[in-house]
Amino acid sequence: MREFSRGSEWRRWDLHVHTPGTNKNDQYEGSAIDDRWNNFYKSILDYIGDGSDKSKSIVSIGVTDYLSIENYKRVINEKRLPESIKLVIPNVELRMTPMSRNEGINIHFLFNPAIVDDLEDCFFSQLSFEYNSRRYSATRTQLISLGKALDSTLDEDAAYSKGVAQFIPSLDSLRNLFSNDPKLRENTIIIVSNSSNDGVTGAANIFSHIGGNSSDFDATRQSIYQFVDAIFSGNPSDALYFLGEKSDSPDEVIRKCGSLKPCFHGCDAHTNSKLFEPDNQRYCWIKSDPSFNGLKQVLYEPKDRVRISPLMPEEKSNYHVIDSMVIDDPDFSPEPILFNDKLSCIIGGKSTGKSILLHNLALTIDKKQVEEKIEKSKTKTRILTKVKVFWKDGEVNETGAVNNSHKIVYIPQTYLNQLSDENEEKTEIDAIIEEIIMQNDNARTGHEQMLKDIQDYKPSLDKRIYDAVRINTELLNIKNEMAEIGPRSGIEKQLDSLKKQKDTQSKELSISEEDISKYDTAISELTKLKAQLR
């Protein structure tokens, strides 16, 4: 079985760890160098423990030093790190111009461990710094020479330290080195600090402080970002910016920086107490296999494969995660099949057992559901005699056992087709889709808010509907009354006819207008009196 059979998983990495004997600022505990190394390893063991605490289980470290990989080699040769640390990467740190505060900009070169033996020739001897018209490389001998050129009274160790401190190459010299060696570039991940102290931001601040216009530094800043692969920063604002999710769009970040960039972060430990403990618990989580190629994959998917957070990203409850399954059948391997807690895909050619595997996995967990869906989909799949499914919470499902303590959704082949053929307004497809959508926090929150809004507006809406129905009823009654009375035109014609009859009869009976008026008044008075008597 492969060592990392589950695929990419979130694990803690710390790519910026100095060791005892580091070329600058060694503050590890112990009077002698061997004592400091012993205390260093003990601190690591104490921190990681048995590895059960995921927030303290470090899978990869970048052994960091200024212009040297000697301490990296010592760590590899001594083999005293916990077994949980699967990958150790050489991280060469140096300063480059332009200046950031009192030093150059902090830049790191993380090398593929496979090319460590080549670095003396292809990297250290090719680095270039000029002092007093003489070119110096970054080999130990040349750094000692540089130190002595600066102060001839120094012994070799002191001269070496002096040379390391003063060796500050230019961005152009570094760019040329890697441009001339494609193999070296392919096996190197270059990371620059964005700190306001020793990073690109610090250099920009210095430029402004000495009277320059900050925009005049843009070309230099962008040249640095275009040269590197990633950023060393625990600042959430930096992480958003270099993903194109802040002041600049993704296209604009790519234009300025060459690509979207991941932000890594490390403890930058120079003391025992600082090991694996960056400020504010800004731990670096990376989703990949602990390998150099796994780390390189982050460069292509920076948004999905790295997080700076105190807690593991996307962590699920153990009772929601299938850990593995074991099949006891002569046609299958007896080795456990391990699952990723995010996404597992069953890949294979036709008739290689994909449906059998999925069917028996579901059948072992929820037999009733599987049998009902198989009946509807009209499919037949081979049933294996003995299967065990192991959950991350320790629960075990076995073939034939009735156990519905864990919920799954099983969708056999042709099942959705069968549901689609049903002439019903709502089918199980709707429930399946809704359940999947509701797994998204934003969708679920929006749905819950919508239901709340409906509940809040319902009384007002009900009243408006009632009023509309009442008014409509009144209108219908009025229309019915009008229909019984008759149309307006007919009534007007009838009035005209009655008026004509009145005029005719008045003439025939010699009734004067005054008599008619008195008669109308009497009728009106009589009507009033009858109303009063009632």
Region roles according to the model:
Residues 1-57, 70-89, 94-126, 195-351:
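Charged catalytic cores and adjacent phosphate/nucleic-acid-binding surfaces used
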Residues 61-62, 113, 340-373:
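Phosphate-binding glycine-rich loops of NTP-binding sites
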Residues 93-168:
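Flexible, acidic/histidine-containing loops and adjacent segments that form or flank the divalent-metal
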Residues 440-534:
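Long, non-membrane, amphipathic alpha-helices that form coiled-coils
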Residues 368-384:
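Short beta-strand-centered segment that lines the nucleotide-binding/catalytic pocket of NTP-utilizing
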Residues 379-455:
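P-loop NTPase motor core
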Residues 65:
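Nucleotide-cofactor and metal-assisted catalytic machinery
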Residues 143-213:
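Hydrophobic, aromatic-enriched interface-forming segments
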